[in-house]
């Protein structure tokens, strides 16, 4: 039950302004069926739970109306604390400072992020191959891939809503005609 989980996450913290969750957002391949996208998101979320020992909750979002039909994505929330027999316990590796991670012989936050991106690449590519697609996901940036494509600027929810209503938006999608 989601509400029980997130109430427990709030209750586990002593500070009222404590972080109770980390979000990982992943783009789901639009070439996959809804069932295949769900299986991929579920597998990745389970991998995060297994790796960090935390509770994981996720939601899949599909494109809205006449927007980019390829914008299938998942929002994955991880508790900041590990799941233990009595409830939520110590902070997970993802929440520790690099100084402490290094002292414990664990990957730094930068290395953890790279590993998550590699894990997503591996899982997404496996699911694409199983579905008969020869497309591949690459975890690297455009620059690291040697592409001279400028990354687009994320509009954000409020600017997107204004744009959909036909209002003037300073931060409009620059790649709309390249879709």
Task: Please place each PLM-identified region on the residue numbering.
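Active-site acidic/histidine clusters and adjacent loop/turn architecture
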Residues: 11-39
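A general structural signal for short secondary-structure junctions and capping/turn motifs
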Residues: 16-17, 48-50, 64-68
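Structured core elements
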Residues: 25, 57, 75-77
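A short, contiguous, amphipathic alpha-helix enriched in charged residues
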Residues: 30-60, 116-123
């Amino acid at each position: 039950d989601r509400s029980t989980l997130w109430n427990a996450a709030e209750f586990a913290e002593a500070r009222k302004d404590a972080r109770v969750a980390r979000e990982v957002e992943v783009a789901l391949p639009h070439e996959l069926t809804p069932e295949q996208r769900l299986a991929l998101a579920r597998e990745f979320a389970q991998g995060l739970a297994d790796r960090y020992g935390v509770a994981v909750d996720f939601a899949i979002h599909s494109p809205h109306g006449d927007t980019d039909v390829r914008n299938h994505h998942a929002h994955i929330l991880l508790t900041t604390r590990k799941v233990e027999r009595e409830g939520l316990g110590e902070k997970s590796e993802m929440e520790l400072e690099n100084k402490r991670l290094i002292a414990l012989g664990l990957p730094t936050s930068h290395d953890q992020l790279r590993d998550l991106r590699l894990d997503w690449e591996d899982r997404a590519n496996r699911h694409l191959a199983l579905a008969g697609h020869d497309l591949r996901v690459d975890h690297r940036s455009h620059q690291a891939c040697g592409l001279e494509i400028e990354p687009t600027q994320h509009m954000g929810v409020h600017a997107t809503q204004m744009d959909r209503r036909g209002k003037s938006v300073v931060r409009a999608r620059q790649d709309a005609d390249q879709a």
